[in-house]
Amino acid sequence: MRHSIGLAAALLAPTLPVALGQHIRDLSSEKWTLSSRALNRTVPAQFPSQVHLDLLRAGVIGEYHGLNDFNLRWIAAANWTYTSQPIKGLLDNYGSTWLVFDGLDTFATISILWTANRIHGQSVSPVSGSMYLPALEACQRRILIRKVSFRGGVTAEVNTCYLHIEWPDDVQLTYEYPNRWFMRKEQSDFGWDWGPAFAPAGPWKPAYIVQLDKKESVYVLNTDLDIYRKNQINYLPPDQSQPWVVNASIDILGPLPAKPTMSIEVRDTHSGTILTSRTLNNVSVAGNAITGVTVLDGLNPKLWWPQSSVIRTSTMFLSLSKVEGTRPWPVWTNGRASAPFFLNQRNITEVQRAQGIAPGANWHFEVNGHEFYAKGSNLIPPDSFWTRVTEERISRLFDAVVVGNQNMLRVWSSGAYLHDYIYDLADEKGILLWSEFEFSDALYPSDDAFLENVAAEIVYNVRRVNHHPSLALWAGGNEIESLMLPRVKDAAPSSYSYYVGEYEKMYISLFLPLVYENTRSISYSPSSTTEGYLYIDLSAPVPMAERYDNTTSGSYYGDTDHYDYDTSVAFDYGSYPVGRFANEFGFHSMPSLQTWQQAVDTEDLYFNSSVVMLRNHHDPAGGLMTDNYANSATGMGEMTMGVISYYPIPSKSDHISNFSAWCHATQLFQADMYKSQIQFYRRGSGMPERQLGSLYWQLEDIWQAPSWAGIEYGGRWKVLHHVMRDIYQPVIVSPFWNYTTGSLDVYVTSDLWSPAAGTVDLTWLDLSGRPIAGNAGTPKSVPFTVGGLNSTRIYGTNVSSLGLPDTKDAVLILSLSAHGRLPNSDRTTNLTHENYATLSWPKDLKIVDPGLKLGYSSKKTTVTVEATSGVSLYTWLDYPEGVVGYFEENAFVLAPGEKKEIGFTVLDDTTNGAWVRNITVQSLWDQKVRG
């Protein structure tokens, strides 16, 4: 049944009525101060908060402009104390008083003073999620939280606690601060190759004083609602004909009832109609948990689907009666009915082999019994300081995901376990969240104390988010199996088997049972990237036998990640991995000029200025040095090579314009490289590898700096996110030009679940826009039918066979028109897509000035773009500072005489609409022209 370990953190339900026998005081309403010897003064503080932000509000420091990520390191090195003013008005007729912290980051000591002058303190080292202190010995009307102290400078000291552990040389990955693997704190707080290392501290989540009645009281710490098909097992596909099972478990604080009852009510989310009410059976009390189960025979609720045109579900309400026959207390809502997700890693069957699928094993997701193509990206922490991340900000980010035709985000470890409201937003918007435990790119301790601590962390979080239909998977960590174990094998081959054993001890023997004991509806993988498993035996000491490198040539097994910074092979299809699923891949680029201007002074806006280079953390410093020019030059050089190898080299006389053009050029390379890979992976859905997912690195930025992101800090879209929106459409036409052999193939790829049919028009133009005689020997139109989750080749030739006078003066325009049914829909929908191909790199093309004309309709709030004298490649609409939003289409091709009317979605506007006068349009021609 349900498994709970120790003080497995507290989840406050602040809306619970006082009838539950509790009095709750939100400590965010109290007055707080922040102090430190390093500051030598006291400043006002907020709660929840983080030290850097309180110092910023008090005017002690500024934003991390320029190189302030280095200049502010004194904050992480100091000890800091939050102190409340006396908290008055507490009740004196309650049986116990509890102090509940939802999140303290990270090494904290709490001291409490109340009117009887009695002091209670407890060290917290560290707090993985929430925690609650034992009941105070007396109920008093006044409490002073004398100190919530956070210890700084521990990254060096913590190593002394683990002197018995010796890692193999050159294996552990230090980005800036050392020894992060010993601390249960957001690992990217200590630096990563896409973000700064502020190592923030503070009470980053709410805190409460909870008073429980002497006779009848319930305080909900956590709720686990597991909804699955009868007889379902995590690693096997559920039988969709079986009835639903609801297994509910409530972790409570206070005296456990002897004979409690539990009940659920299921309603249609939209109409509010009650579909069924049930009393749970086999209610049991164990530890601090009350658990019950019921089978929903005969109930067929509306199901949740990812990226459905309408998210129609049923909502579950859970109630608890402390004593049988007494009035029930509503303790939980918002359990949306959904078929559990299943990660299929089973062996390829003979039926699949007969369909042309290569031997090996599957690696794809299934929802409600349907396999589907996962399209998305990787989510990193959206800010260095979580307390300024708002629900509105995440909602806007997720809207960009939906608009970008993505249905899945991989929640990368190691950030923080996501807030509940983020899962709520994913539920609402139909976004799947591949979730991971917070272990990344490191070897971690495996002593009993460490494992006991992380076991509580895992149990709490599995139970906390299990009711969300957006939860797609739990993975044990990031790249532990695919990166860290091979690093051990290379650096210390004699120790390899030992560290494989340590890996299995934690990520399989410990984590897998903890997941399976707390949910039957979600699959588990011990690492983000694996070759899958050989077998599962839950009675074995290592219940999942990983495949590792026990693979056979010609067979495919697991998922892949891929980073190749050799730009000479960026568009070589033979350099891309062939697997069942791509969970990470990418290349970095510069943010736009407007985003750079938020953080860097004008005099520093040069491509290789000191400030720009030191804000680039790829390659990372590997320590706390502040002159990482040598490593940074590697990443800057990679971007430079990507530009000069394939694109016109910007050469503007004005240094700001030149800097902006270079930033844009790096984005063109990044977007083209991702597009090339995603077209390759999506085509794989119809190839022997049966490839069913691509999640690129990364969705968004944590600050203003070079990174792999498609959405810049502040919300501005790079070229990448626009191009991903286009190439993630349901049915696409894609050209594949092999520049070595000269072959040119055109494929149609579909992620619909049923066949789609239509035509593709193929039109050859020279770059002045004139049709090439005889269409270069290419058919003008090709009909096609493509199967569900499949791809089909509609045209193939060799460049040498085409009637092209000059391959540097030619472009193939592809226009698809089709009809088919979207997933989970009975209606036929018209679908279109446009693409293009050139047979020379952009830098070598004989482009002409396209004569772009730009207009704006205030009545329609649309922009009109027209090419008048040549083909416009990489047509790019841009908007000025003072507004944030996105164009409905961008980075497109325009032929002469072609006019596009494009809408713009405004998210923020501080210009009172004046921004429209400063919209600009450019193309590849502008990158080439000297100015």
From Swiss-Prot:
GO cellular component, one term: extracellular region
Post-translational modification: N-glycosylated.
Positions glycosylated per UniProt: 40, 79, 247, 282, 347, 550, 608, 658, 738, 790, 798, 830, 918
Main location: secreted
Function: Exoglycosidase that cleaves the single beta-linked mannose residue from the non-reducing end of beta-mannosidic oligosaccharides of various complexity and length. Involved in the degradation of polymeric mannan and galactomannan. Releases the terminal mannose residue from mannobiose and mannotriose, as well as from galactosyl-mannobiose (GM2), galactosyl-mannotriose (GM3) and di-galactosyl-mannopentaose (G2M5).
Assembly and interaction partners: Homodimer.
Name this polypeptide is given: Beta-mannosidase A
Organism: Aspergillus niger
Record lineage: Eukaryota, Fungi, Dikarya, Ascomycota, Pezizomycotina
